[in-house]
Amino acid sequence: MMCNLLLSCSVLLLSCSHLLAHPVTDTADMTYSGPDSVEEAGGVNPDDFSVSDLNEHLQRAAVAGYSPLFSQENIKVPGQIPKEALRELLLEKPYRLIPPRGLWGSRRQFRKRGGGADCFWKYCI
């Protein structure tokens, strides 16, 4: 028993020694030396891209074997729902919005017990 305790403490101390070897820096003393704005960082404005640039990037991605995030036929971001699909979902197939009954759990009715059972609400003794 004492051997297990001693072994556990030594393993704990050995594992903590690696953590104590790293210096702890206070972030209040550190200064941010990055650019103050996007223009200074050399970022690209999304309005600067044209459709030809986008097609060029898509072709490069297709050659590299990546699946493009944008489709070339109709440029759209995945996750956006077209109006026709939204209309179909809301008007024509409203049952798709209701989750299956199993997710909410069953709502079976509790019947009263006959006899001299002491019951409070639905719990009987």
Swiss-Prot record:
Residues 109-111 form a propeptide. Keywords: Cleavage on pair of basic residues, Disulfide bond, Hormone, Secreted, Signal. It comes from the Eukaryota. Disulfide bonds join 119-124. The keyword Transmembrane does not apply. InterPro entries: Urotensin_II. One of its GO terms (cellular component) is extracellular region. Residues 1-21 form the signal peptide. It holds the Pfam family Urotensin_II. It is found in: Secreted. Its main location: secreted. One of its GO terms (molecular function) is hormone activity. The keyword Acetylation does not apply. GO terms for biological process: blood vessel diameter maintenance; regulation of blood pressure. Urotensin is found in the teleost caudal neurosecretory system. It has a suggested role in osmoregulation and as a corticotropin-releasing factor. The non-hormonal portion of this precursor may be a urotensin binding protein, urophysin. Belongs to the urotensin-2 family. This is Prepro-urotensin II-gamma. It comes from Cyprinus carpio. The lineage of its organism: Eukaryota, Metazoa, Chordata, Craniata, Vertebrata.
